Amino acid sequence: MSRDKNLKEDWEQVLNILSATFGDGELLNLDAIIYLIGVQELGQGAKEFKKDDKVNLMHIAICHLLEPFGYYEFDFFDNDGWPHYKVLEELPPLKSGEQTVLMKEAIVLYFKANKLI
């Protein structure tokens, strides 16, 4: 089975699991999944977040998801319990489709590492 086909099947599994739980009958988009991973990685449970916090949650998720690829490394938790990452390597210039594939690969890896798929 090809790598692309495996990614597609794994991605659909992740999408179906999360959409069934959080989608209210709709399929979640990539940004919503990244946001949910940020909430999970923050570890403070489900609560109301301000707009700036939502952006920061997505940043946490992206850093955490790209850590295994060597782009980021966890640095410290601040006084509010928010994780901070340092850049190890700048992301290469990617086209929109390439960014999407990279994030899907990272999310599938995250779910496999956490034994959720």
Which residues fall in each region the model found?
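Long, acidic, intrinsically disordered low-complexity segments
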Residues: 1-23, 112, 117
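Intrinsic, low-complexity terminal and presequence regions
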Residues: 2-3, 31-35, 90-93, 113
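Structural motif
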Residues: 22-30, 47-57
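Amphipathic alpha-helical interaction segments
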Residues: 25, 41-44, 64-77, 110, ...
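Short, hydrophobic/amphipathic alpha-helical patches that form generic packing surfaces
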Residues: 31-45, 57-68, 105
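Helix-rich interaction surfaces within compact, conserved domain-sized segments
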Residues: 90-117
